[in-house]
């Protein structure tokens, strides 16, 4: 397997750039570049870097030599901390390309080697991928929990309990001829075992029923809807603090769904400004209204700017808003209103934002709970379904097989088996150098 290299720090220019080299040729590379022996392990040293062919000095670098297996990839690892100018980085990378047994790393290849060498598990790699794409505080916390091994610890706890049950079953097979157990004792033993399995299933179902990491990544779907010129565009600008939608006193300014992602107190949200709902013969406007209706159907929260009895049906929560309360003609405020707001004066905006955050915390994953992605949730479900077969069984062989099937799901969760077809997709999400 060839040794790989890549720029592992951010884009230049920068104060310092870190170039990472991983593989069996890392030590020889250090000697070639510095014209000196390999330095002491895990101790940063200052070395001049040279082009082995021309002898030209490339830079003065802080060099860190990390021998396998205690490295981030499980392989010999060399880090070059060079000056972060583009010319310096380009010169070092071009020199590395010319060296034997070296090639540029592909996206996520350092992390993939860490997984293949047993440094991290599959779910930890997935958590790291989510951490790299996290844009809000809640996404960051969930990804850190996963990459820190929270799911692995839960799986290990489940496995230990199943292995204990499996050991009891094996013992009953081994000593069946030597120990006579009356029917009452046998049924009691089976009932206790099934109670333990039922408790495990209940724990699996709790994980299965939680919102997924994809749900957290996509954010809360908040849709603003109402009749034309109801103040939707002005309100979305006020809610996000951005100039998202065109506002004008002319009805029908918005003809399509305008979306913007925004975080309120760390809660990711995707706001959608929609076309005003009314009868129209204009083909373009009708298309916009149809898209608005689809957005309403998919909304987690519908902010309805209109009369409560006219609010569309949706599976999500509906907040009836009464906008433009800065205008005298908008008073008195009618009943059946959740929040009265003014995008001009800001009245009611803070209250509306607090309400959105409150609902978001109920819908999105909780910060103190392990958040699974769809693949992980499906495997937890399959493990629970396998264990459920044991609840109706009277034969210990069937129960033992149900436990084995559940354990195979755990192996797929951690990446010990049956995951080759999804690895390329996972690691392609990583940047080069990670």
Curated annotation (Swiss-Prot):
- Quote the InterPro entries the UniProt record gives: G_TrmE, GTP-bd, GTP-bd_TrmE_N, GTPase_MnmE, MnmE_dom2, MnmE_helical, P-loop_NTPase, Small_GTP-bd
Q: Which cofactor does it need?
A: K(+)
Q: Write one Gene Ontology MF term.
A: GTPase activity
All residue ranges annotated as the TrmE-type G domain in the record: 219-361
- PROSITE patterns given for it? G_TRME
- Tell me the keywords, alphabetical order: Cytoplasm, GTP-binding, Hydrolase, Magnesium, Metal-binding, Nucleotide-binding, Potassium, tRNA processing
Compartments where located: Cytoplasm
Q: Which domain of life is it from?
A: Bacteria
Question: EC no.?
Answer: 3.6.-.-
Binding, (6S)-5-formyl-5,6,7,8-tetrahydrofolate: 20, 79, 119, 434
Could you say which residues bind GTP here? 229-234, 248-254, 273-276
One GO cellular component assignment for this chain's record is: cytoplasm
Annotated binding of Mg(2+), by residue: 233, 254
Q: What class of enzyme is it?
A: hydrolase
Q: Which GO terms describe its biological process?
A: tRNA methylation; tRNA wobble uridine modification
Say which family it is in: Belongs to the TRAFAC class TrmE-Era-EngA-EngB-Septin-like GTPase superfamily. TrmE GTPase family.
What protein am I looking at? Answer: tRNA modification GTPase MnmE
Organism whose genome encodes this protein: Zymomonas mobilis subsp. mobilis (strain ATCC 31821 / ZM4 / CP4)
User: What gene is this protein translated from?
Assistant: mnmE
């Amino acid at each position: 397997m060839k040794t790989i290299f890549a720029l592992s720090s951010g884009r230049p220019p920068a104060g310092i750039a870190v170039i990472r080299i991983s593989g069996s040729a890392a030590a020889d590379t250090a000697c070639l570049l510095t014209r000196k022996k390999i330095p002491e392990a895990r101790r940063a040293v200052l070395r001049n870097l040279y082009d082995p062919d021309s002898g030209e000095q490339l830079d003065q670098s802080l060099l860190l030599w990390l021998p396998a297996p205690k490295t981030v990839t499980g392989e010999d690892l060399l880090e070059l901390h060079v000056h972060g100018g583009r010319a310096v980085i380009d010169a070092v990378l071009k020199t590395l390309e010319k060296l034997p047994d070296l090639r540029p790393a592909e996206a996520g290849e350092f992390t993939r080697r860490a997984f293949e060498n047993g440094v991290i598990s599959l779910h930890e790699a997935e958590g790291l991928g989510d951490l790299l794409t996290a844009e809000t505080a809640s996404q960051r916390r969930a990804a850190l929990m996963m990459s820190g091994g929270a799911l692995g610890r839960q799986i290990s706890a489940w496995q230990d309990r199943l292995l204990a049950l499996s050991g009891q079953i094996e013992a009953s097979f081994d000593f069946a001829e030597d120990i006579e157990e009356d029917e009452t004792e046998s049924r009691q033993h089976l009932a206790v075992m099934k109670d333990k399995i039922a408790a495990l299933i209940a724990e699996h179902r709790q994980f299965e029923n939680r919102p997924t990491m994809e749900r957290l990544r996509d954010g809360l779907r908040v849709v603003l809807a109402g009749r034309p010129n109801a103040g939707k565009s002005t309100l979305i600008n006020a809610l996000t603090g951005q100039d998202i939608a065109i506002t004008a006193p002319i009805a029908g300014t918005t003809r399509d769904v305008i979306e913007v992602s925004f975080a309120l107190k760390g809660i990711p949200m995707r706001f959608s400004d929609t076309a005003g709902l009314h009868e129209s013969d204009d083909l373009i406007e009708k298309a916009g209204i149809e898209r608005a209706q689809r957005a309403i159907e998919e909304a987690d929260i519908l902010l309805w700017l209109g009369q409560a009895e006219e609010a569309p049906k949706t599976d999500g929560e509906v907040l009836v808003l009464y906008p433009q309360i800065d205008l005298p003609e908008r008073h008195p405020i009618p009943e059946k209103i959740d929040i009265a707001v003014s995008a001009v004066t800001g009245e009611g905006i803070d209250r509306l934002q607090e309400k959105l955050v409150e609902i978001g915390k109920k819908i999105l994953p909780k910060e103190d709970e392990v958040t699974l992605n769809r693949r992980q949730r499906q495997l937890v479900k399959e493990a629970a379904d396998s264990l459920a077969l044991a609840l109706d069984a009277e034969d210990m062989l069937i129960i033992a097989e149900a436990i084995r099937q559940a354990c195979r799901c755990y192996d797929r969760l951690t990446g010990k088996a049956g995951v080759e077809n999804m690895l390329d997709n996972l690691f392609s999400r990583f940047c080069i150098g990670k």
